[in-house]
């Protein structure tokens, strides 16, 4: 009887471990993103889409710029236009920063008006041309 109980308990423990945690879907998706040099400035432009089922307000796009070997160098923020994004809506961002000559690629992050980090799909890295 004890042996059966031990086998039953071990089986239940093993069955409980098979469940894998399902990752949450992204809140936003990068539709387009580009960076181009112009004189002493790098201009970042792009479009993002709200992929969450909820509206997003006062979203900030964070541009993380990297030197070779993915070495972090600079982070800048830009507000989306418009401020309110219904599910499925798209918004543009535009940002400029001084060109140090070392930056080669960038990635995007986002946060809402309450400084909550948003999950972003297709966020890079993108080349700086």
What name fits each language-model region?
Residues 7-17:
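Hydrophobic h-region of N-terminal signal peptides that target proteins for export
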Residues 1-6:
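Bacterial N-terminal signal peptides that target proteins for export
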Residues 48-52:
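Asparagine-centered strand-capping/turn motif at beta-strand->loop junctions
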Residues 94-129:
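Terminal connector regions
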Residues 73-102:
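Intrinsically disordered, low-complexity Pro/Gly/Ser/Thr-rich segments with frequent PxxP/GP/PP motifs
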Residues 17-47, 123-129:
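Low-complexity, acidic Ser/Thr/Pro/Gly-rich terminal tails and inter-domain linkers that flank the onset
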Residues 53-71, 110-112:
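Short acidic, flexible loop segments centered on an aromatic residue
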Residues 26-27, 58, 68-79:
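Short beta-strand and strand-turn-strand segments in soluble, beta-rich domains
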């Amino acid at each position: 009887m004890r042996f059966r109980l031990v086998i039953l308990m071990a089986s239940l423990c093993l069955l409980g471990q098979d469940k894998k945690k399902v990752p949450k879907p992204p809140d936003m998706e990068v539709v387009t993103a580009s960076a181009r040099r112009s004189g002493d400035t790098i201009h970042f432009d792009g479009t993002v889409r709200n992929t969450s089922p909820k509206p997003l307000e006062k979203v900030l796009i964070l541009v993380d710029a990297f030197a070779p070997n993915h070495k972090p160098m600079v982070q800048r923020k830009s507000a989306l236009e418009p401020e309110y994004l219904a599910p499925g809506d798209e918004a543009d961002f535009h940002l400029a920063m001084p060109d140090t000559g070392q930056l080669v690629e960038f990635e995007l992050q986002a946060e809402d008006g309450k400084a909550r980090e948003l999950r972003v799909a297709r966020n890079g890295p993108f080349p700086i041309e």
